[in-house]
Amino acid sequence: MITSVNLQDVKDKLYLDLKDTGWDDKLKSFLQGTEMDKILEILLKEAMDGKRFTPPVKYIFRALKSCHFNKTRVVIIGQDPYPQIDVADGLAFSCSRQDRTEVSLQYMQKCIMDTVPQEDRAPVQSNDLSRWADQGILLLNTAFTTSIGKPGTHQILWRNMMVNILDALVWNSDPLVYVFLGKKAQ
């Protein structure tokens, strides 16, 4: 059980996780501000009340850590993390479980197979999409967390963080391709 947590320590850790990704400078004021305090307080309260959320804290900003700001070429935005235990891994549509492919990922894979010529596509080798992130595809959800078994519960919580991220991307000098998947993401 969680007994004592210093929010500033958590904020500092999350900020340091983004060091050298280009996101640290773009999001510094948000990450070090009072809004991030509120987000962390809500997540901490849920944890202390015995409620679980996903993905695990160490993966909350994995999408940003995995795709350097200056190397981002495509932004794929989904709704929120898979709401099952041990499925969400911090990258939208990616899945830490290899024994079962989630329906939304199956749909994406089918769309790729149906629209991209075979000679132009790499084979899908796993449910982990970190290779996509390595290639400049930012795999974001509109919410970075959700309660276990309850999709959409943290949408409002992360809204301003997403606004900050999208603002930073829009004002990026390089043109980007945006793909919004799902009604909530659109």
Language-model segments: what does each one mean?
Residues M1-L16, D20, D167-V170:
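Class I S-adenosyl-L-methionine
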